[in-house]
Amino acid sequence: MIKYLKSKGIYHLNLYGDGFSGKGKPDLLVCINGRFVAFELKVGSNDMQDDQIIHKLRIERSGGLHYSPYTVEEFISIVEDLLNEKA
C-alpha cells in the first residue's frame, strides 16, 4: 500500500506498528486532493476496536474521512475514487 501511494505521489504517514502513535490511532494518514484521509487497515474478520471507533468519530467530526479497507484492492479502489473526485 505504501508503494502504491508513493507511485501516485500521495503524501502519507505510516503509523502502523510505530509504538509511539497511541492506542487506536489509524494505520495510515494520507492527503488526497487536499483532503485528510485516515485508513485503519483490517485483515480477515478483524473488526475495529472501541478505541479505533473513537478516533474514527473524531476524524469524521473534524471533516476528515476515515476508511477501514480489508483488502489491498479495496484500499486502491478507495484511493482511486478519491483521486478522481473534483477538488
Describe the residue ranges of each PLM region.
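Catalytic phosphate/metal-binding cores of nucleic-acid and nucleotide-processing enzymes, i.e., regions
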Residues: 1-87
